[in-house]
């Protein structure tokens, strides 16, 4: 089995992901931060170390696909897309669950770069 290194910078990134999730839900006044906060280490590990993807070319044919089957935890994916350079900005996270935002309540394929499946 391959050993995965985990440095202080990784822990800080996960802590940041958790805070971003909590702040986004607090700002909009509704949503589900708990799952995004608890899945932050796993999602970070997948996006940063495991999944083959290219944020500059999110439709690259050789990419791995991440399907978030629990759509109400959309922040899990949105935060990783933000941290991973898929084109989401901090203002997009702040606009969570608002009309016309790139961060609707559930991930939507074709709406947010990096989202592979609508859940």
Regions found by a protein language model. Give the residues of each.
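Short secondary-structure boundary/capping segments within folded domains
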Residues: 31-34, 56-58
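General secondary-structure edge motif
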Residues: 1, 22-23, 57, 61
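N-terminal capping segment at the start of a domain
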Residues: 16-30
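N-terminal hydrophobic or amphipathic helices/low-complexity stretches enriched
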Residues: 1-19
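Cofactor-binding active-site loop characterized by glycine-rich and histidine/acidic residues
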Residues: 7, 39-119
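Short, flexible active-site loop motifs that bind/organize anionic cofactors or intermediates
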Residues: 4, 32, 83
């Amino acid at each position: 089995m391959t050993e995965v290194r985990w440095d202080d910078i990784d822990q800080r990134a996960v802590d940041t992901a958790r805070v971003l999730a909590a702040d986004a839900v607090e700002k909009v006044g509704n949503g589900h931060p708990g799952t995004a906060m608890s899945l932050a280490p796993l999602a970070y590990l997948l996006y940063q170390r495991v999944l083959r993807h290219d944020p500059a070319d999110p439709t690259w044919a050789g990419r791995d696909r991440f399907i978030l089957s629990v759509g109400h935890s959309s922040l899990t994916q949105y935060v990783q897309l933000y941290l991973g350079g898929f084109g989401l900005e901090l203002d997009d996270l702040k606009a969570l669950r608002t009309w016309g935002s790139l961060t609707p309540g559930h991930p939507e394929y074709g709406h947010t770069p990096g989202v592979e499946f609508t859940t």
